[in-house]
């Protein structure tokens, strides 16, 4: 695959976490630093989709959402609008267990025909760990204009590729949405 840009969707304040989600600490480090650590062996082209000054300590370009209050789809729209590469790795900011190996698998198995490539097990699809092609921007724009913001609805509209994973691999793709989920994660790892 030609050059790739990574965009981390930092979202905003999480009501369930009471703070910026990407800055929640896990093993003494913010979530976002775990994610960046997994990306760096692959590319240094990393940009953050956020308007928050709380991420200013990181040496990466920060891009505020072009459209507000449109959830992850708005973040992906912003990312692809600013991207200079055909292929883009889009990641949410709440996946501290993501590994370089899983990201490399995603990148190596992506085919040019697919507008989106994501992981899925029998029980769960992971749309916010994916390769997104810049060419699907018009489809995302239409979805936002129609207020059709569900990620699974977007997948249904776009030629996409699902990389099947075992149920046990879901663990590394887990997104942490609440303090309870973070506690569960810490217990599972101890």
Swiss-Prot record:
Residues involved in Mg(2+) binding: 94
Cofactor annotation: Mg(2+)
Lineage: Bacteria, Pseudomonadati, Bacteroidota, Flavobacteriia, Flavobacteriales
Keyword Cell inner membrane recorded: no
InterPro entries cross-referenced by the UniProt entry: MobA-like_NTP_Trfase (IPR025877), Molybde_CF_guanTrfase (IPR013482), Nucleotide-diphossugar_trans (IPR029044)
Stated family: Belongs to the MobA family.
The protein's Enzyme Commission number: 2.7.7.77
Function per UniProt: Transfers a GMP moiety from GTP to Mo-molybdopterin (Mo-MPT) cofactor (Moco or molybdenum cofactor) to form Mo-molybdopterin guanine dinucleotide (Mo-MGD) cofactor.
Entry text on domains: The N-terminal domain determines nucleotide recognition and specific binding, while the C-terminal domain determines the specific binding to the target protein.
Subcellular location: Cytoplasm
Organism: Flavobacterium johnsoniae (strain ATCC 17061 / DSM 2064 / JCM 8514 / BCRC 14874 / CCUG 350202 / NBRC 14942 / NCIMB 11054 / UW101)
GO terms of molecular function: GTP binding; metal ion binding; molybdenum cofactor guanylyltransferase activity
PANTHER family documented for this protein: MOLYBDENUM COFACTOR GUANYLYLTRANSFERASE
This protein's name: Probable molybdenum cofactor guanylyltransferase
One cellular component (GO) term of this entry: cytoplasm
A GO BP entry: Mo-molybdopterin cofactor biosynthetic process
């Amino acid at each position: 695959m030609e050059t790739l840009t990574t965009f981390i969707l930092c979202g905003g304040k999480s009501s369930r976490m009471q703070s910026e989600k990407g800055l929640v600490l896990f093993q003494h480090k913010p979530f976002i630093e775990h994610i960046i650590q997994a990306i760096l062996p692959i590319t240094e082209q990393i940009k953050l989709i956020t308007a928050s000054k709380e991420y200013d300590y990181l040496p990466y370009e920060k891009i505020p959402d072009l459209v507000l209050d449109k959830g992850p789809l708005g973040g992906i729209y912003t990312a692809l609008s600013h991207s200079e590469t055909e292929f883009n790795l889009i990641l949410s900011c709440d996946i501290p267990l993501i590994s370089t190996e899983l990201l490399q698998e995603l990148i190596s198995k992506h085919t040019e025909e697919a507008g989106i490539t994501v992981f899925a097990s029998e029980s769960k699809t992971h749309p916010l760990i994916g390769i997104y092609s810049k060419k699907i921007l018009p489809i995302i724009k239409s979805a936002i204009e129609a207020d059709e913001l569900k990620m699974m609805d977007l997948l249904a509209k776009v030629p996409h590729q699902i990389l099947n994973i075992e149920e046990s691999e879901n663990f590394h793709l887990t997104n942490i949405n609440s303090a309870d989920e973070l506690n569960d994660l810490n217990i599972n790892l101890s």
